[in-house]
Design a protein with these regions (language model features):
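Conserved catalytic or metal-liganding residues and their short signature motifs at active sites
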Residues: 1-250, 288-293, 297-305, 313-344
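Conserved SxxK-family serine transpeptidase/carboxypeptidase catalytic domain
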Residues: 240-287
Length: 344
């Protein structure tokens, strides 16, 4: 065989070998490497994770770790690990997976109606990386609260219920600073001016709003309920709000899981500044986290002459309002008879 034929043959062999090798590499990089059956899943890589830890997190979700490892090394992923929340989709190949691990997907963080700052910290810890203790320590730090005009009692009013976008690996300190910023944004010039017109601070508005929030779930009724409490405050009357008594009992016993369906005379005797049957004015802080509709209901309360209200037996969730104690007692008696007939 002539030399040039040998060279040609060797060239063909080399090309075929290179092609075969290239194809095998291609298959490893671009073949489907997902093992789960769901359409998509999220995985979470903690702050400071090593490459080995990333593999452990991925192990249940990919078909061939060696294929992923080879691709990750070629794309320098082990030297550039990012913490966060990442989206994996069915049908992804190893190249797709590495690319996905470089795209931190935000969390739509939500919260509402927590009664205590501890409950709030627990709710947030379910949605971002820091644990509830680190979040609680961050948001109850005295220096932080004082710098933003809050106390331990009013701290919960800093957090305005809504949906916010956060990266999962947001730190506790970053979270609290963002929330302080959102609070300032919420209390814009218009809302602040309305609070000043009521001779109230934003914290006092939130305080009263928490009572309104607990009194009625009917958003359209909240301005009317707020009007009752504004009338009582302006007349120097006790608020006598049942939700404050329930909160006072829970705080006094340390049990916020207990369910109190009806306020009894024994509950009215609890010695707590949150008991508005015994102590005048607003309680020291919110009895829950009021939502935006309750805050705006106080700022835009309905002007009327009502001083009392009780649950309505005819309109589920709504209340009957009265201008005099005599009329209120009639309304309350009707409701109590109805409750007794229901066997409650």
């Amino acid at each position: 065989m002539k030399l040039k034929n040998i060279i040609a043959l060797l060239s063909v062999v080399i090309v075929l070998g290179a092609s075969a090798y290239g194809y095998s590499i291609y298959k490893k990089i671009f073949a489907d490497n997902i093992s789960f059956s769901e359409r998509e899943i999220f995985i979470h890589i903690p702050t400071g994770a090593t490459y080995n830890q990333v593999e452990e997190i991925l192990e249940p979700h990919i078909s061939d770790m060696s294929k992923f490892r080879m691709t990750a090394e070629k794309k320098n992923y082990p030297q550039n690990i990012r913490s966060g929340r990442f989206l994996l989709k069915k049908g992804m190949n190893s190249n797709d997976i590495v690319n996905a691990l470089r795209q931190n997907v935000p969390v739509k963080l939500t919260f509402n109606n927590q009664e205590t700052i501890e409950q709030f910290a627990g709710r947030i810890a379910q949605q971002i990386e820091p644990d509830s203790l680190s979040i609680l320590q961050a948001i109850t730090d005295n220096e932080f609260l004082t710098s933003h005009g809050f106390t331990q009692e009013t701290a919960i009013s800093m957090f305005v219920p809504n949906t916010y976008e956060f990266f999962w690996n947001t730190s506790a300190l970053q979270f609290r600073e963002r929330m302080a910023k959102e609070h300032r944004k919420f209390w814009n010039t218009e809302r602040t001016a309305k609070a000043e017109a009521l001779n109230m601070t934003p914290q006092q508005v939130s305080n009263l709003a928490s009572i309104v929030h607990k009194e009625t779930v009917k958003v359209d009724e909240r301005p009317k309920v707020a009007g009752v409490y504004m009338n009582r405050l302006n007349k120097g009357m006790l608020l006598q709000a049942d939700p404050t008594v329930i909160f006072a009992v829970k705080k006094h016993t340390g049990d916020f899981n207990q369910v109190i369906k009806r306020v009894l005379y024994k509950h009215l005797e609890v010695d707590s500044p949150y008991n508005t049957y015994k102590f005048s004015g607003l309680p020291p802080g919110p009895i829950a986290m009021p939502d935006i509709s309750a805050i705006d209901a106080v700022l835009n309360y309905e002007k009327h002459d009502y001083l009392y209200f009780c649950a309505s037996m005819d309109r589920n969730g709504y209340h009957e309002f009265a201008k005099t104690l005599a009329q209120h007692n009639i309304n309350a008696a009707k409701y109590q008879r109805w409750v007794s007939q229901q066997g409650y």
